[in-house]
Amino acid sequence: MFDYERLEALSIEGEAPQSEPERQYYFMKKCRQWAEEEKERIGHPLTMSIQTLGCQMNAKDSEKMTAILEYIGYKEVEEPVADFVLYNTCTVRENANLKIYGRLGYLKNHKKKNPSMRIALCGCMMQEVDEVERIRKSYSFVDLVFGTHNIYKLAELLYTQVQSARPVMDVWKEAKEIVEDLPGKRKYPFKTGVNIMYGCNNFCSYCIVPYVRGRERSREPEDIISEIKGLVADGVVEVMLLGQNVNSYGKTLENPVTFANLLRQVNEIEGLKRIRFMTSHPKDLSDELIEAMAECDKVCTHLHLPLQSGSTEILKKMNRKYTKESYLSLVERIREKNPKLSLTTDIIVGFPGETEEDFEDTLDVVRKVRYDSAYTFIYSKRTGTPAAAMENQVPEEVVKERFDRLLHEVQGISAEITKGIEGETVPVLVEEINTQNEELLTGRLSNNAVVHFPGDASLIGEILPVKLVESKGFYYMGEIVK
């Protein structure tokens, strides 16, 4: 829970402090002072629209930026146009970049009508030099551009832009320090993500993440535990431990700590009910972690274990550092200790050089592991990655046919697994009012499956026994057991 008293106690007379996070507190207060004057000038409260693309870590970053802007004096609106529009970008797939350019085109005319409007871009796409140069040349109406390493400097960058009345572009190649003690606005009051590390050292040949998120950097376990205790005191019952590869946690610390050890420490926090984590790289998932998952009673019965391909040959080209056989052996060890564990995965179809035999290996793993669900993707060429320069790009029609076959296989298995616990009564965390039917609530099982059931909004945030009355393939219809 953020200490606003510490923020309010800081003086903004004189020069800005050099140390963080005090420097950012200074600029948050300076911006707040400006926002009061701006509100009087334009004759209405300042509004903001924050749109987030990509992963859970981007969502967590957006929570921080939302809270900073709210403190400054902006009110969040649902509309895509506001006095301050911020896009927190993703660049894992080329389509995400194209989406941003489309939205910028839409905003251009609105900015002409409202010169006081400010447009900001941050996140992974901004770490790509070519994209930033394109924005500089063709989208000069954008006011703020910053990357993944200085998200925490939002207030300082905004104040610089306000004072100079010129675009500010500040993208760092690497992180200089980890700054976490900033406000955050949780989407749900009862659950949230907690960053335990940043960056990635794996350099999978198709992936741009290490280039845009930087090398691995772990937070000190004491800081993580302290943050979670504060969140629990503020009503949080479930945390998601976040990192590009949580299994590598602690390796860069002065006093190394394993992720399994951290998990055991988090499990001891009084008042916390559920622990989730993502993402896990198979090559780093240790027997120590398998033991910890089985023994820690608060760890949810769900593991996301990206496969990407079932072909050892393709995995080698992907630089995944495991084989089909070692992956299946890992799953066997996991299931031996955690027989009720739900496994989900990521699979890429159409990686350069993928043959029919390679694809059949992927289907073979899917059938043997029997994933509860899978995120399936058609390979997307990312400029700057080794895979983009590989020969033997798979024809589009072949990829589409394979993708459909994979989807059919995954969906069939998923429906069978979901049907398997139909009729059981299980603990469910009530998350929200159903978006399709206001008379229903939506909740999540420990295994990450979703169930919809009749109930009152006052139950949101509670963990209740719910009977899974009917399986609908990818979700359940249920009823509260009283």
Model-derived regions: residue spans:
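Contiguous mid-protein beta-loop-alpha structural module that forms a pocket-lining wall or clamp
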Residues: E354, D361, V369-Y371
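Radical SAM enzyme [4Fe-4S]-AdoMet core and its adjacent flexible, acidic
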Residues: C55, G250-N267, G271, M318, ...
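Conserved, mostly hydrophobic/aromatic
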Residues: C204, I224, L241, F277, ...
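Terminal RNA-binding accessory module
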Residues: L10-E13, A389-K482
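Flexible glycine-/small-residue-rich
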Residues: T52, T279, L307-S309, V430-E432, ...
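Conserved SAM/AdoMet-binding glycine-rich loop
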Residues: S116-L121, D130, A233-E356, R367
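Proteins enriched for Cys/Gly/acidic motifs involved in redox and nucleic-acid/cofactor modification
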Residues: M1-Y249, E288, L303, E325-E336, ...
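Short flexible coil/turn linkers enriched for glycine and charged/polar residues
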Residues: K187-F190, C200-N202, V299, S309, ...
